[in-house]
């Protein structure tokens, strides 16, 4: 189990092309948790015809996705959010007010297999962030 491939965006110039190459035409789905416009565009370019892009991250800027590619390739783009807009606004306010302090642990990406084992075992508290800068 685990990842079949790891692609370092600092080492690979065209990440979507590399994903399409490794997956024989593109990924079936991409889940974007980043808040970067680049990540969303790369996700659309990385999935195969009929694939899906799930948007979880909330970018602060307007997105400029390739509508032509989305339509011609039948790519499904969906948002994923748990709760209502009011719930989200309140959660952000709690964070801004210091009422809720997130528990975040940073681990080097080479520890990913151990992190996934901990996730499967249910022993992680808070959020776990994999540091790709450690590559």
Segments the model singles out, each with a brief description of its role:
Residues 1-42:
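Adenosine-nucleotide cofactor-binding segment
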Residues 10-15, 57-61, 82-83:
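Short, acidic/turn-prone active-site loops that include or flank metal/cofactor-
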Residues 34-35, 57-58, 134:
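Short glycine-/small-residue-rich Rossmann-like dinucleotide-binding loops
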Residues 41-44, 85-135:
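C-terminal hydrophobic helical "lid"/dimerization subdomain
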Residues 57-73, 85-93:
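Rossmann-fold NAD(P)-binding glycine/threonine-rich loop
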């Amino acid at each position: 189990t685990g990842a079949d491939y790891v692609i370092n965006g600092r080492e690979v110039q065209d990440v979507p092309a590399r994903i399409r190459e490794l997956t024989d035409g593109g990924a079936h789905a991409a889940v974007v948790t980043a808040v970067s416009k680049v990540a969303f565009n790369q996700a659309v370019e990385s999935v195969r015809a009929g694939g899906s892009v799930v948007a979880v991250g909330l970018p602060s800027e307007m997105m400029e996705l390739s509508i032509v590619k989305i339509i011609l390739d039948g790519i499904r783009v969906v948002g994923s959010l748990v709760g209502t807009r009011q719930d989200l606004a309140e959660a952000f306010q709690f964070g801004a007010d210091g009422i809720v302090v997130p528990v975040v642990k940073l681990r080097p990406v080479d520890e990913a297999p151990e992190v996934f084992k901990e996730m499967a075992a249910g022993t992680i508290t808070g959020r776990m962030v994999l540091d790709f800068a450690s590559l």
